[in-house]
Amino acid sequence: VDEVSETLSPENSPNCMKKLLPAFPLTSSSSFNARRALVAAVAASPLIPALAQFRVEVSGVGLTQLPIALVPFKGQDAAPQKISAIVQADLERSGQFRGVDASGQALDEASRPDLTLWRQRTADSLVVGSITRLADGRYDIRFRLWDVVRGQDLGGQSYTVPQGDLRLASHRIADYVYEKLTGEKGIFSTRIAYVTKGGNRYSLWVADADGENAQAALASPEPIISPVWSSNGSQLAYVSFESRKPVVYVHNVASGQRRLLANFRGSNSAPAWAPDGNSLAVTLSRDGGSQLYTISSAGGEPRRLTQSSSIDTEPTFSADGSTIFFVSDRGGAPQIYKMGASGGAPTRVTFNGSYNISPSVSGDGRWLAYISRVGGAFKLHVMELATGNVAAITDTTADENPSFAPNSKLIVYATQLGGREALMTTTLDGKIKARLAGQAGDIREPDWGPFQKQ
């Protein structure tokens, strides 16, 4: 486990060069600039690297998992990161892959493997590659993916990266493999935001999807809650109590600059970005009780959406922007409702249980994740929106704040394990869970960021 992650900034992070590796043999091709984990601090505060990284622990067995062998990359023992191990951890965490023993083999992307051997080892797919340190200190990473069953070369890529981007390159490899073998986009190079509390100090963090490379965007002695990504991943909205009341800010991830969005009379809370990035839904008490409003992402006068004497809060948009799901106690207890994004008569969504909160809608529009109180325990549930079928998918008792991965295949949430708060990811059926166990304080309020442009 790395103790300190390298700080990346627009000034010190060189371009990450990627090349497509076509079918055997290798040929050269053009390069492009890959995404950088550029997280600057609020105002004049310096960017703070994580003091303790996460430890990924995967548990459970999926009903259908693709057996894949990842041969240790040639030369990786001399590198600061074990590329094949990172790729394998990513794929296993997705719940759709299981690792096959790849020991005793020495292969790289230029090798033509004996696929009969790998069939005997029950592998359906094979990843081989190499990593070489260049004279300028950067690393050249190359890999190739093989379909063992069909005997096909599925191509590969190469990356030339600085040391600080070795994990990013590994996540890109996992994305490539995942998409080639499942037909769905991989989420391993996306980011998550979350809040930690250590003593009397609160911090807002941005990290890779596996919890590594965490960088602090904000630290405060006052609570920070409700971080939420914009649809293009360039901004985070959040609520800060530094003014001795809840106020909504918008933070530019690349520059570290922030601006005040909502500081009206009373409480300003629960921001949610519209998918087009032009507006946000917020909960305000400026006119009395807590009601839902929309406000331009540039600020200005909010527009009221709900007109009730109850508490309406926790808005979240559907992926197409047409619908807002939210929590209201208008029926006597907190339940999840939905309405048009411009307002209108709400429709109740949840009926199982007397206390349902924290809605999150999947990007494909098929699923609703939320927290339901069951016999005094707070448990993560998933509803299929087309049928209304609901399933509890955790065995913990203090789950909070679910958020879907951008490919709708995983959920990140906060919970309590061993008396401490921690982040977990789970497949939608609850069969594969990964604990992201931090050591820097209680962890809460996760939000999974969108796909990034490559």
Residue ranges and their predicted role:
Residues 1-33, 37-47:
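N-terminal secretory signal peptides
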Residues 57-117, 127, 132:
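Short beta-strand->alpha-helix linker/helix-N-cap micro-motif
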Residues 111-176:
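Amphipathic beta-strand/beta-sheet edge segments enriched in Tyr/Trp
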Residues 149, 208-212, 252-256, 296-300, ...:
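Short loop/turn segments that connect beta-strands within beta-propeller blades
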Residues 185, 196-203, 219-222, 239-248, ...:
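A flexible loop/linker signature enriched in serine peptidases of the S9 family
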Residues 187-188, 231-232, 275-276, 319-320, ...:
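Residue-level detector of Asp-centered blade-edge/turn motifs that repeat once per structural unit
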Residues 192, 236, 277-281, 321-324, ...:
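Hydrophobic beta-strand positions that form the internal "hydrophobic ladder"
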